From Swiss-Prot:
<keyword id="KW-0997">Cell inner membrane</keyword>
<dbReference type="Pfam" id="PF22895">
    <property type="entry name" value="DUF7024"/>
</dbReference>
<dbReference type="GO" id="GO:0005886">
    <property type="term" value="C:plasma membrane"/>
</dbReference>
<dbReference type="GO" id="GO:0008960">
    <property type="term" value="F:phosphatidylglycerol-membrane-oligosaccharide glycerophosphotransferase activity"/>
</dbReference>
<keyword id="KW-0812">Transmembrane</keyword>
<dbReference type="InterPro" id="IPR054288">
    <property type="entry name" value="DUF7024"/>
</dbReference>
<comment type="similarity">
    <text>Belongs to the OpgB family.</text>
</comment>
<comment type="pathway">
    <text>Glycan metabolism; osmoregulated periplasmic glucan (OPG) biosynthesis.</text>
</comment>
<comment type="function">
    <text>Transfers a phosphoglycerol residue from phosphatidylglycerol to the membrane-bound nascent glucan backbones.</text>
</comment>
<feature type="transmembrane region" description="Helical">
    <location>
        <begin position="77"/>
        <end position="97"/>
    </location>
</feature>
<dbReference type="GO" id="GO:0009250">
    <property type="term" value="P:glucan biosynthetic process"/>
</dbReference>
<feature type="transmembrane region" description="Helical">
    <location>
        <begin position="26"/>
        <end position="46"/>
    </location>
</feature>
<dbReference type="InterPro" id="IPR017850">
    <property type="entry name" value="Alkaline_phosphatase_core_sf"/>
</dbReference>
<feature type="transmembrane region" description="Helical">
    <location>
        <begin position="108"/>
        <end position="128"/>
    </location>
</feature>
<keyword id="KW-1003">Cell membrane</keyword>
<dbReference type="InterPro" id="IPR050448">
    <property type="entry name" value="OpgB/LTA_synthase_biosynth"/>
</dbReference>
<protein>
    <recommendedName>
        <fullName>Phosphoglycerol transferase I</fullName>
        <ecNumber>2.7.8.20</ecNumber>
    </recommendedName>
</protein>
Length: 763
C-alpha cells in the first residue's frame, strides 16, 4: 500500500509542478532534487533486492558507504551499468517534464504544493522507511528488556549420548521443497525431510541473512551485529569472545568438533568464529587440497559439494570407529548465488522451469541429491543409532536465477532433524527463526532448551512467537548485541606484531591491514575483506576532521605522504586527519609499539580534497619514481603511459591474466631507446613453462623461455621504428582459481612477472 501511495504522491507532484507551478529556478531545483531523491531511493531498493533478495539491509548500508567487490561481482556488472544508464535517463526526462511550462509565470501556491507532495512521496516510500530504520538502529542505546530475553545456557550437557552431524545447505531454503511450486526439484532430500522432524516456519531475521551470520545465529542464538561489516570478520582475532555457543558446550561436554567446507575458511572469518567457540578441527579449501582425489576439480568458491561431502563421510566413518564423542559440521557451496554450480557426479544436472533450463534450480536439484546421498550413507551405517542429523539452510537464497519464482511463495529457511536413536516423523508449524536452531539441537542432545535469544522449538517459546514485530525488536537489540563484543572505546597505545600480521590495542587484536576511525568515546575498526573497498577508498569517505589510524603496506600510503616509501612492501602506520596533519611511520621492528597522536589543527579543505582525490586513484593509474617496473606494488613507473593484460599485485609480483587481455602490453610515454636490453625477472605458470614466449617491440620479436621458478633473462632489442610498446604473449594461458579472490571467476594465468627493466645500450 505504501508503494502505491508514494508513487501517487510522486506523480501528483510532477504533474502539478509541470502544468501549474510556472517558472522559478529555486523551486525547480528544490522540486527536482526531492523527486530525484525519490527515484534514487527506489532504484536503490530495486538494486538492493537484486543483490540481496532482502531489500535494504545492514549489508547494503555498509556497501553504500564502501563498494561491492568480491564474490561473483562480475555477474552483476551489466545490471549495474543498466541501473546507472536508467538513472541518467530518468533524471533527464524528469527535468524536461518539469520545465515544460517554464515560460508561464511562477505560482507560489502550486510550487509549494508540488514540493510538499514530493516530500510526502519520499517519506511514504518503503526505501526511505527501511533506510531510516537502519540508521536508527546504528544510533540506539539498545532495549532495556534485552537482558531478560538473552539467556546463557549451562556450559555442559549432563550425560551426552549422541553424536551430531550438522549440514548447512548454502541458500537451500525450505521454499525449494514445495513440490507443487517446483515439481520433482528435491525428491531425494525432500523424502528424508519428510521422515524426520520438519520445522516448517523458520523466519530469517536481520543479522542472520548471509552465511557467517546464519552460522552465528544458529550456534550462538544471536544475530551477527558487529562494530564492523559482518563479512569483514576475518580481521578479528576472536569472535563474540564472551558468548557461550553450541560448539563451546559440545567441547566442554567431551565432544571433538569438526567443520568441513569447500571454500577458504578465512572468508568472512569462519575460521576465527569456529576456533573461538570450541572447534579444533577445521577443513577448508587449503586443508583439503592435499587429501582430495582431484585437487583441480573446483568451482569459483572452492571444492564442489560431492567432493566435500565425500570427505565428510570419510571423517564420519573415522570418528565413529574411534568411539570418540564428536560433532561434524559441514557447509555446501554449489547453490551459491547468482547461478550455482553443478557437481559432476550427480544425476540431476538439469532442471527446466517455465519451459527453459534454470541454472539455480539445476544447482539445487544436484546439491540436494549429494546431501541425500551423504545422509543415506550415515543411515545405512551401524553408527546411525547414535547419531542426530540436522539439515538447515544458512540463510534464504539471495538474488539468483530462481529468485523471482521463490518470491511468489511463502519463504522460510530449512531446518529438519533426523534422529537415529528415536525416529520421529512430524511437521511442526510453530513460528521460529534461525536463532532457535542451536537451542533445539542442544535440547535434543540433553542440554538446556535455550541459547542466547534462541529457544528450543520442542520445549520453549521462540522470540518469533513472543514478538509480533520480531524484526523491529531484533534491530532494537542491535546495540546490546554489539556490546557483547566487549570492544574498546579508546585507543592510546598499540602494538604491531609483524610475524603474526596483527595489531593489538586496549585488549583487542586485529589482523592487518586495518583502518580505524578514532573518536573520544569510540574506536571503529574498518577491516579489508573480499566484500569491502580497499582501505584507502574507505579512508576517502572520512570527514576532514575524523581522526584515523591506518596500518597497511607502505606503498599504499606513500603516494600521499611518504614518496620515499613508494616501493616498500613493509608495514607502515599513518595517522592524523585528512584535512589536517598526517604522519607516516615505517614499522621497522618485529614487535613495534606506537602511540596515537592527533593534533587539533586548522582544517585545510584544499588539502582535504587533494588527499581524497589521491586516495581514489585506481591502482592501474598510480605512478611512482623508479627505473624499472616493480610488479609487487600497485601502479607503474612514471615512464609508463598505460598497461593491460596484467592481474593485481601479490606479495611476489603479478600474473598475466588473459581474462584481461590475450597479451601483456606495456605502453611507454616516449619511444623506447634505439638499442636496449630488456631485463625480465619472471616465472611461467603450468604449461607455459619451458615453452617459447614471444616478446615484441615494434617489428622485432625475441623469444623468452621461463620455468616454474623465478629467473632473470636479458633480451637484446633494436628499435629503429621508435616503437613505444612492449608486448609479451603467453602461449597457453591456464584457467585456474589458484591465488584468486574467493568467489571471483577463474583467472587465465600465463607468466608471473617480478620486474621488467629497460636498459639503454650504447651505439
Amino acid at each position: 500500500m505504501s508503494e502505491l501511495l508514494s508513487f501517487a504522491l510522486f506523480l501528483a507532484s510532477v504533474l502539478i509542478y509541470a502544468w501549474k507551478a510556472g517558472r522559478n529556478t529555486w523551486w525547480f531545483a528544490a522540486t527536482l532534487t526531492v523527486l530525484g531523491l525519490f527515484v534514487v531511493l527506489n532504484i536503490t531498493l530495486f538494486a538492493s533486492d537484486y543483490f540481496t533478495g532482502d531489500g535494504i539491509n545492514d549489508a547494503v548500508l555498509y556497501t553504500l558507504t564502501n563498494s561491492l567487490t568480491g564474490a561473483g561481482v562480475s555477474k552483476y556488472i551489466l545490471p549495474g551499468i543498466g541501473i546507472v544508464l536508467g538513472l541518467t535517463a530518468v533524471f533527464g526526462a524528469l527535468g524536461w517534464i518539469l520545465r515544460r511550462r517554464r515560460r508561464h509565470p511562477h505560482h507560489f501556491g502550486y510550487s509549494l504544493l508540488a514540493l510538499l507532495l514530493a516530500l510526502g512521496s519520499v517519506d511514504a516510500s518503503p526505501a526511505f522507511r527501511q533506510i531510516t530504520e537502519l540508521v536508527k538502529s546504528q544510533s540506539r542505546d539498545g532495549d532495556p528488556d534485552f537482558a531478560a530475553y538473552y539467556k546463557e545456557p549451562s556450559r555442559t550437557i549432563p550425560d551426552p549420548k549422541l553424536n551430531l552431524v550438522y549440514i548447512y545447505g548454502e541458500s537451500l531454503e525450505r521454499t525449494y521443497f514445495d513440490n507443487e511450486a517446483f515439481p520433482d526439484l528435491t525428491p531425494e532430500l525432500g523424502a528424508l525431510k519428510n521422515e524426520g522432524l520438519d520445522f516448517s516456519h523458520t523466519q530469517q531475521l536481520p543479522g542472520t541473512n548471509y552465511t557467517i551470520a546464519g552460522m552465528v545465529a544458529s550456534q550462538c542464538g544471536i544475530p551477527l551485529f558487529a562494530p564492523f561489516e559482518g563479512n569483514a570478520s576475518a580481521s578479528v582475532s576472536s569472535f563474540f569472545p564472551q558468548n557461550i555457543c553450541l560448539g563451546d558446550i559440545l567441547k566442554n561436554s567431551g565432544y571433538q568438533n569438526y567443520f568441513v567446507q569447500g571454500a577458504n575458511l578465512r572468508f568472512a572469518g569462519k575460521d576465527v568464529f569456529l576456533k573461538s567457540h570450541g572447534f579444533d578441527h577445521l577443513y577448508g579449501s587449503e586443508e583439503l587440497k592435499s587429501v582430495v582425489a582431484d585437487p583441480h576439480y573446483r568451482n569459483d568458491w572452492g571444492f564442489y559439494d560431492d567432493t566435500v561431502l565425500d570427505e565428510a563421510w570419510k571423517k564420519f566413518e573415522e570418528l565413529s570407529r574411534s568411539g570418540q564423542r564428536f560433532s561434524l559440521f559441514t557447509l555446501t557451496v554449489d547453490t551459491h548465488h547468482p547461478d550455482g554450480f553443478i557437481s559432476r557426479t550427480c544425476n540431476r544436472k538439469k532442471y527446466d522451469f517455465d519451459g527453459k533450463p534454470n541454472q539455480s534450480f539445476s544447482a539445487v536439484s544436484c546439491s540436494q541429491e549429494n546431501i541425500a546421498t551423504f545422509i543415506n550413507k550415515i543411515k545405512a551405517s551401524p553408527w546411525f543409532k547414535d547419531t542426530v542429523i540436522v539439515v538447515s539452510s544458512d540463510h534464504l537464497a539471495m538474488n539468483n536465477t530462481a529468485w523471482k519464482y521463490l518470491n511468489k511463495q511463502d519463504r522460510n529457511n530449512l531446518f529438519f532433524v533426523i534422529r537415529g536413536d528415536k525416529p520421529q516423523q512430524e511437521t511442526l508449524a510453530v513460528k521460529r527463526n534461525t536463532m532457535d536452531n542451536g537451542a533445539t539441537v542442544l535440547d535434543i542432545l540433553g542440554g538446556d532448551n535455550y541459547l542466547g535469544l534462541g529457544r528450543s522449538s520442542l520445549s520453549g517459546q521462540s522470540m518469533s512467537e513472543i514478538f509480533l514485530n520480531i524484526k523491529e525488536k531484533t534491530l532494537a537489540w542491535k546495540p546490546d548485541i554489539i556490546r557483547l563484543w566487549k570492544f574498546p572505546k579508546e585507543m592510546k597505545e598499540f602494538t604491531i606484531d609483524q610475524q603474526k600480521n596483527m595489531i593489538a590495542f586496549s585488549g583487542s587484536h586485529f589482523r592487518l591491514p586495518l583502518l580505524l576511525r578514532v573518536s573520544d568515546k569510540r574506536v571503529e575498526p574498518l577491516p579489508e575483506s573480499e566484500y569491502s573497498a580497499p582501505l584507502r577508498f574507505q579512508l576517502a569517505d572520512f570527514a576532514p576532521r575524523d581522526n584515523f589510524v591506518w596500518v597497511d603496506r607502505c606503498y599504499k600510503m606513500a603516494q600521499l605522504w611518504a614518496p620515499e616509501l613508494a616501493l616498500s612492501t613493509d608495514w607502515c602506520v599513518s595517522q592524523g586527519q585528512l584535512g589536517g596533519q598526517q604522519i607516516v611511520q615505517h614499522v621497522d621492528k618485529a614487535i613495534w609499539k606506537g602511540k596515537t597522536a592527533f593534533k587539533d589543527t586548522v582544517i585545510d579543505m584544499a588539502r582535504y580534497k587533494g588527499n581524497v582525490d589521491t586516495l581514489k586513484i585506481v591502482d592501474n593509474d598510480i605512478r611512482y619514481k623508479a627505473d624499472s617496473f616493480i610488479f609487487n606494488v600497485a601502479g607503474a613507473p612514471e615512464e609508463v603511459k598505460q598497461f593491460s593484460g596484467i592481474s593485481r599485485p601479490e606479495s611476489w609480483g603479478r600474473w598475466s591474466n588473459a581474462q584481461l587481455g590475450d597479451e601483456v602490453k606495456i605502453e611507454y610515454k616516449h619511444p623506447l631507446p634505439k638499442k636496449f636490453d630488456l631485463v625480465i625477472t619472471a616465472k611461467a605458470y603450468g604449461n607455459n613453462a619451458s615453452r617459447p614466449i614471444p616478446v615484441r617491440v615494434g617489428n622485432e620479436e625475441q623469444t623468452l623461455v621461463l620455468g616454474n621458478e623465478v629467473t632473470t633473462t636479458t633480451l637484446h632489442f633494436d628499435n629503429p621504428t621508435d616503437a613505444d610498446t612492449l608486448v609479451i604473449v603467453p602461449p597457453e594461458p591456464v584457467s585456474t582459481n589458484e591465488g584468486n579472490i574467493l568467489g571471483h571467476s577463474p583467472r587465465k594465468l600465463g607468466i608471473g612477472m617480478v620486474e621488467i627493466k629497460v636498459v639503454e645500450r650504447e651505439g
